[in-house]
């Protein structure tokens, strides 16, 4: 299942990778505009504590807008990974994002120091043995299974 926010982020990443940071910022800001507190919106008490004010009903959108210059002057892929992480939290696409951007090994080792058994080949998952058993004619295991799992 795909949401509109994810579609905007895919378009933003595609635009940014092509060097069109202005269009990328437009798409990212569409997502951020939806997520921002809007003028006059009632905020939960926990937000007041973090924000430091009571009955503060101003919009937060201007404070979270991203500009073309910000995208141009940052590691764009890492920026998009962070943005996707916030927007798509819990939607089970983080592994695919990290593998697709070739950041899987680096990020897991950085943010999960207890993952001592992690190897580069873990970016690929093992092909189920039941699938391999059904192949006809049967091939050599090194040709049928992803590297590291044989």
Task: State each model region's role.
Residues 37-43:
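Boundary/linker segments of alpha-helical solenoid repeat arrays
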